[in-house]
Amino acid sequence: MRFTLMVTGPAYGTQQASSALQFAKALLAEGHSLESVFFYREGVYNANQFTSPASDEFDLVRAWQQLHDENGVALHICVAAALRRGVTDENEARAQGLPGANLQPGFQLSGLGALAEAALTCDRVVEF
């Protein structure tokens, strides 16, 4: 089956993003296809490369990047939600007059159209 995940919880503070990552890994291990992960609302914090967990904590931001690097899973973050929460890439930082970017490599700013397209082309959309 072909899946898309939507993550609305931040990297830390709730279980949503961690559960989504575990689910994503389980899908791939079982031979399913994971087309994309769409981060929305507080979920965009999963793409903030300035997140720096303690040395004894799991680094969820880098784990999402690793999932992308190893499996080619597209990691989309809602551009409107991201800008409201201070997460941006170089292009948006320049356009908004911000001093710098903090989008973790492997993630891409996208509109809700990316989620709509994924929902149309996948068998299941699972929200965390």
From Swiss-Prot:
Coiled-coil stretches noted in the UniProt entry, renumbered to this chain: none
Superkingdom of the source species: Bacteria
Keywords linked to the UniProt accession: Cytoplasm, Transferase, tRNA processing
Cited InterPro entries: DsrEFH-like, Sulphur_relay_DsrE/F-like, Sulphur_relay_TusD/DsrE
GO cellular component: sulfurtransferase complex
A Pfam family assignment: DsrE
Subcellular location: Cytoplasm
Molecular function per GO: sulfur carrier activity; sulfurtransferase activity
Transferase recorded as keyword: yes
Enzyme Commission number: 2.8.1.-
Active site (catalytic residues): C78
Gene3D superfamilies: DsrEFH-like (3.40.1260.10)
An example Gene Ontology biological process: tRNA wobble position uridine thiolation
PANTHER family: PROTEIN YCHN, SULFURTRANSFERASE TUSD
Family: Belongs to the DsrE/TusD family.
Subunit and interaction comment: Heterohexamer, formed by a dimer of trimers. The hexameric TusBCD complex contains 2 copies each of TusB, TusC and TusD. The TusBCD complex interacts with TusE.
Function: Part of a sulfur-relay system required for 2-thiolation of 5-methylaminomethyl-2-thiouridine (mnm(5)s(2)U) at tRNA wobble positions. Accepts sulfur from TusA and transfers it in turn to TusE.
Protein name: Sulfurtransferase TusD
